[in-house]
Amino acid sequence: MPPPPRLLFLLVMLLVVAAPGAPVFGANAPPEVKAEIDALLMFRSGLRDPYAAMSGWNASSPSAPCSWRGVACAAGTGRVVELALPKLRLSGAISPALSSLVYLEKLSLRSNSLSGTIPASLSRISSLRAVYLQYNSLSGPIPQSFLANLTNLQTFDVSGNLLSGPVPVSFPPSLKYLDLSSNAFSGTIPANVSASATSLQFLNLSFNRLRGTVPASLGTLQDLHYLWLDGNLLEGTIPSALSNCSALLHLSLQGNALRGILPPAVAAIPSLQILSVSRNRLTGAIPAAAFGGVGNSSLRIVQVGGNAFSQVDVPVSLGKDLQVVDLRANKLAGPFPSWLAGAGGLTVLDLSGNAFTGEVPPAVGQLTALQELRLGGNAFTGTVPAEIGRCGALQVLDLEDNRFSGEVPAALGGLRRLREVYLGGNSFSGQIPASLGNLSWLEALSTPGNRLTGDLPSELFVLGNLTFLDLSDNKLAGEIPPSIGNLAALQSLNLSGNSFSGRIPSNIGNLLNLRVLDLSGQKNLSGNLPAELFGLPQLQYVSLAGNSFSGDVPEGFSSLWSLRHLNLSVNSFTGSMPATYGYLPSLQVLSASHNRICGELPVELANCSNLTVLDLRSNQLTGPIPGDFARLGELEELDLSHNQLSRKIPPEISNCSSLVTLKLDDNHLGGEIPASLSNLSKLQTLDLSSNNLTGSIPASLAQIPGMLSLNVSQNELSGEIPAMLGSRFGTPSVFASNPNLCGPPLENECSAYRQHRRRQRLQRLALLIGVVAATVLLLVLFCCCCVYSLLRWRRRFIEKRDGVKKRRRSPGRGSGSSGTSTDSVSQPKLIMFNSRITYADTVEATRQFDEENVLSRGRHGLVFKACYNDGTVLAILRLPSTSSDGAVVIEEGSFRKEAESLGKVKHRNLTVLRGYYAGPPPDVRLLVYDYMPNGNLATLLQEASHQDGHILNWPMRHLIALGVSRGLAFLHQSGVVHGDVKPQNILFDADFEPHLSDFGLEPMVVTAGAAAAAAAASTSATTTVGSLGYVAPDAAAAGQATREGDVYSFGIVLLELLTGRRPGMFAGEDEDIVKWVKRQLQRGAVAELLEPGLLELDPESSEWEEFLLGIKVGLLCTAPDPLDRPAMGDVVFMLEGCRVGPDIPSSADPTSQPSPA
């Protein structure tokens, strides 16, 4: 039965009356409302709105602006009273038009990216009660009268901006909350704050640049609850007048330069709960009132650390609410303050960094609520009381750097909540208690610098939450147990300075979160390093120094892209230094001294642009010092001493402008000391002794301002020691054992040296005269022989003419050979970096560049297969000589320079230039590369599609993507932009290792016309900056190749590799491979993305997750905005993270994978 009409009418009316909906004006909105709409739209027009939060602000809406997001209106009038748009990443400036919102009461734009100044016109909105502009990038000063004009303002928060200038001096009486913290305000704190802001309850001026003193007038703010002035430059004393702030709850003055005492009256404010005056220069005694008791029973937290307090006034009683007592880093002495044991509710006690002595009393066990006990950096002695085991709530125990002795208390194993234990720098002995294995929440265990003995207890290796383990500098022995691999959360492992022996267990490869590994100074660790060590992707610090490791210098470290510190010193490593270490972009310290490393210094180390220390002393290195080391602009220490290096010191080394230490002593270096070394303005130590250096000492070395140590002894230097160097380094041993060197501080007088030089010149002159005389004599003899021969020939001619018979010479006697000798004019040779091949050999190997030998046609010319008589197979790129538009190859000198530069770009995933040829004929330009027998990725994907894709399983696709990303990342790191990343330019060697090709060739052709002619026959159309379907829209529009464009092209290749869909399969402007992938993900049709060879992936398996991660990496790389695309180094990191299981080796042949039945 339906309700009666009257009841329905009443219900409708009730709803209408009760609904507080916004007024509906439509086109009949009053002028003042239209003005507010215009002001809001003008405000919106000046902002960038990435979340489109204001997209619904439509002036034609009947309920505008009251229905707009972030806008609230007064009921009935429709006037805007609130504008709240927090946390929306809005950027731009705040429009002064907001001053038209005359009824605005609340303005909240906090946590955005707003910039510019605070509009002064906002001060005309007298109705404003609250302004929230914190956590933006606003700058400039606050106008002095700004706050005073806002007569109804109660809350003003602009913390976390870039505001500067002085703090305003006048405030409205209504102001209760003022937060100007974390800006750049300067000047002093206005003394008249209390005169105008009489109702102030919260005042935060922390983390600015305020100077001067704390105004005593702040003591008149009777309603003040919070006073925070931390992190400024305040001086003077703490005014006792602050004790008049009877409502004060929290006083924080940390991180200033306040002096004098802590006034007892301030500590005794009855309402005070938190007292923080740490990191100042306060002296005297800590007043008893600071610990609660009769004077102040409300105190909960007392922080007075980092001052110069020398004593503590012991309170008669302790506050019942006392929870935190921080007395660290003062000058307190005497025994442990046992009276603190009466604070039963104490949770944090920090006495570290003082001069307390004696034993820790058993009474510490009464602090049953204690969570943190920090006693480090004192002089406590004796044993740790077993009663500490009663502190069942303890989470942090710090006893470092004291004089504790005895065994580590087994009672610690009963403190099940312990997270951090620091026992280093004491004299603990005995074994590590097995009971520590009960601490299932333990995250950090540190016991360095004690006298602990025995093996590592197996119970330690069940601590699944342990992230930090430091047992260094003890007397622990035995082997490192394989169970160490159970510590899956471990990030830092330091076992250095012990007596462990045996090998590093392979289970260390399970520590995938490990960042620091220090096993140095064991002496008895030996054998080869486990390969699993090189699979720890987050490893940043490795020190294996001072052991007995052997074998070749491990090349596996080159796979650890995050590695910053590598120390292999004092071992028995042999072989050469791996060139692949030059591919470690983050490497800062490389030390491999005191080994048996031989061979030449790899020039690739110059690619480590962040390297600060290179220490390879005391090895068997030979050859020259690479001039490319000049690119190491951050290098501070270079020590190559005690090797067998030869040739000259490269003058380019002076480009290492950060060098502090340069040691090249005890080598076979020759030539002169480069005068350019004087450009090393930061150099402090220079040791060139025990070499074969010649010439004079450059006087400019004296211009190095901070040089403290110099040694050029035991060379073959000559001439006079520069006077400034002689007086600066007055020890004769600095210049000793140079027979031809003279002048102070040596005893060799330069006058005697000059006489010796004069005798040498006379001897040389006499020798020269002798040589000239002998030459003249030989010339006279030669002329006489010629005259004699001429006269004899004339006589024979006359005799023959007169008919005189002569005996005929017997055939062959005295006659020359009748045959013509072949002129062995050498054939023109290709400039090969590692072999000798002539141009004629290459013409024969390519059958005179026959079409049948063409491997590919690219935008830079034709690639020929060259099969040489000795079985060598190479790929020859022949650059076009001319084109339809008249473009020609660059002249020979420039071509050679570009080719030499390109030949230095080496990476395992790039096609490396092996040689070049620059004529004759004059228009021939050839580039020589390794032959890639397994074709390119485009062909491989096409074959995969014809065989249901089974020849390309997921691990192989991942390895291809990872290899290409590494090669492209190395190109970008070397300053090279590829410009045409596509499957046709990804080649495979005999081991199916991917190599990125066709890069760095643009400078070798004057214009693009020559490339265009050859590219016309390419399988995919090519633009000036890439290939259609792969080129980034922004790069195509700009007509210029960029790193961001390369990332986009790589993303397209990655999506094609994973899905099997070519970009050319999508027709029309509204569809491409990126949009297609996104649409499948939005539909949840992930199976549609799978290439046929990946259809057997189990959705519950890790490989399924890895595949999805790879898809997401591809979408990140193809972001529409170039600024949103990751760098290739980040792409490598993400792709390395895609494989959570073991990878197949990169040499695996994908065609050997059988197709499933």
Swiss-Prot record:
Expressed in developing culm, coleoptile, primary root, young spikelet, young leaf blade and leaf sheath, floral meristem primordia, stamen primordia, and lemma and palea primordia. This is Probable inactive leucine-rich repeat receptor kinase XIAO. Residues 1-21 form the signal peptide. GO terms for cellular component: plasma membrane. It is found in: Cell membrane. The keyword Transmembrane applies. Functions in the early stages of organ development by regulating cell division rate. Is probably involved in the regulation of a number of cell-cycle genes. May act as regulator of brassinosteroid (BR) signaling and cell-cycle controlling organ growth. Residues 804-825 are annotated as: Disordered. Disruption phenotype: Dwarf plants with erect leaves. Reduced organ sizes due to decreased cell numbers resulting from reduced cell division rate. The protein kinase domain is predicted to be catalytically inactive. InterPro entries: Kinase-like_dom_sf (IPR011009), Leu-rich_rpt (IPR001611), Leu-rich_rpt_typical-subtyp (IPR003591), LRR_dom_sf (IPR032675), LRR_N_plant-typ (IPR013210), LRR_R13L4/SHOC2-like (IPR055414), Plant_LRR-RLKs (IPR050647), Prot_kinase_dom (IPR000719). The chain crosses the membrane at residues 765-785. It is a single-pass type I membrane protein. SMART domains: LRR_SD22, LRR_TYP, S_TKc. Residues 849-1144 form the Protein kinase domain. Keywords: ATP-binding, Brassinosteroid signaling pathway, Cell membrane, Glycoprotein, Leucine-rich repeat, Membrane, Nucleotide-binding, Receptor, Repeat, Signal, Transmembrane, Transmembrane helix. GO terms for biological process: brassinosteroid mediated signaling pathway; post-embryonic plant organ development. Its main location: membrane. Xiao means small in Chinese. Belongs to the protein kinase superfamily. Ser/Thr protein kinase family. PANTHER family: LRR RECEPTOR-LIKE SERINE/THREONINE-PROTEIN KINASE-RELATED, PROTEIN KINASE DOMAIN-CONTAINING PROTEIN.
